[in-house]
Design a protein with these regions (language model features):
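Short active-site oxyanion
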Residues: 42-43, 98-99, 117-119, 140-143, ...
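Short basic, glycine-rich beta-strand/loop surfaces that mediate nucleic-acid
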Residues: 140-184
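Extended interfacial segments that mediate partner engagement and assembly in macromolecular machines
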Residues: 51-121, 125
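Conserved nucleotide-binding/hydrolysis micro-motifs of P-loop NTPases
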Residues: 16, 51-53, 125-128, 152, ...
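N-terminal cysteine/histidine-rich coordination modules
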Residues: 1-68
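N-terminal targeting/trafficking signals and adjacent low-complexity tails
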Residues: 185-189
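Active-site cofactor/cluster-binding pocket
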Residues: 29, 98, 109-117, 127-139, ...
């Protein structure tokens, strides 16, 4: 990521790459989180930590920043997580349409050995595949993720009973990596 796109978090003051942050806006007195924000959009850029966001809501930090009393839905943080998951799954589906997706164990293993992928998704119901992939991945910079269920991955790619998929190295996989960062950082807390 380019260093010129670093910004201080409006909640904590910590420095993050802009692509790793979430954009919060005020719309009709409601606080909204735009997970699909472009880098040039205006609003409050914050780190994607659920803990920091919930703490800011309790302390009314967003009210102070926007200088008005904001309405915040009870399910605000759950909606952010759902939106981040949906964005990732949509990118997986888009990578299939673009011809950048390997589906199935054999194809993923072959692509891992050829160093042509940098994201691997494994259904969270499967316990055996992770070990097999970890042996091949070693110290390479490949994102291995078990966030989604078999049905979620299957629905995203349009097939039934998909246990694993891999995204080939591309701009799309770089975007997917930054969106996974946001999702994982949000889920950690």
């Amino acid at each position: 990521m380019d260093k010129k796109y670093k910004l201080a978090c409006s909640l904590t003051g910590n420095i993050f790459y802009l692509k790793q942050m979430l954009l919060f806006k005020e719309m009709n007195d409601f606080l909204i989180c735009d997970v699909n924000a472009r880098l040039n959009e205006k609003g409050i850029w914050c780190n994607p930590s659920r803990y920091d966001i919930e703490k800011a809501i309790r302390s009314q930090v967003f009210d102070k920043i926007f200088k008005k009393k904001l309405k915040i839905q009870n399910s605000f943080t759950e909606n952010i997580e759902k939106s981040l998951k949906l964005k990732v799954l949509n990118l997986v589906g888009l990578s299939k349409k673009a011809g950048l997706l390997e589906i199935g164990y054999d194809k993923v293993i072959k692509s891992l050995k050829n160093n042509s992928i940098d994201v691997v998704l494994i259904a969270n119901e499967d316990s055996k595949l992770e070990g097999a992939f970890l042996k091949i991945i070693d110290d390479r910079k490949i994102l291995l993720n078990k966030t989604f269920s078999r049905s979620e991955i299957s629905k995203a790619v349009g097939y039934k009973n998909v246990l694993c998929v891999a995204i080939m190295i591309s701009n799309l996989s770089a975007t997917l990596n930054s969106d996974f960062y946001k999702l994982m950082k949000f889920k950690l807390n």
